[in-house]
Amino acid sequence: PGILIIGFPMPGTIDTTQFRRILSRNFALPLIVGALSVAVFVGITAYLVHVLNLVEHTQRVISNTNETAKLSVDMETGLRGFLISGDESFLSPYIMAKARVSDDLVMLKELVAERPGQVDRLRRVESAQRQWYVFADEMIALRRANGDFVTPVSSGRGKILTDDVRREFKDFLEAEQTLRQQRSETAKSVITWSVVAY
């Protein structure tokens, strides 16, 4: 009765090497796969956030450009009202917008600084806008002095300058809208691949 046999494992016991192998297979491997999965998910999420920030940045540029172009139109409208009526109150939109347009163009150049083509377009906008300022200031001076402002206006010089400003704004906006579309498509693609991958 009660004989103890040494050296033989008891039924249902496992040696420590075999236990560690089973433990690593059933615990460590899923843990590693889970950690890699989390790392990939975090990477995809970070990239998606980056792409969405680029879309938002481009939208901000488009919005600011539209506002600046509107100010340019306000200046033209104010000038026209003053030339027709001689009423100085028509110049208030011109004066207010003129001060803001230059600052807005500087800000836009900073927003697109990483894209030299867009910076060049904004420089052309600035150049065309400065030429229009010279024309507008000449017309204002002539109107205030009761001089002949009709002949220079009738020559179409102001319209040509205004059309130049509008064309440059249009080209700039088209490039930004194309970029926004590309970035939006990239974001959609990242979302699609993320969903498919998981």
Enumerate the language-model features and the residues they cover.
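Short loop-to-helix capping motifs
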Residues: G86-E88
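Amphipathic alpha-helical segments and their boundaries
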Residues: L23-M75, V112-Q129, P152, R183, ...
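Juxtamembrane amphipathic/coiled-coil helical coupling segments that flank
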Residues: P11-F19, V42-E56, E76, A136-Y198
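Positive-inside N-terminal membrane-insertion signal
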Residues: P1-I32, W193-S194
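Heptad-repeat alpha-helical coiled-coil/4-helix-bundle sensor or tether segments in soluble regions
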Residues: L71, F82, L91-L179
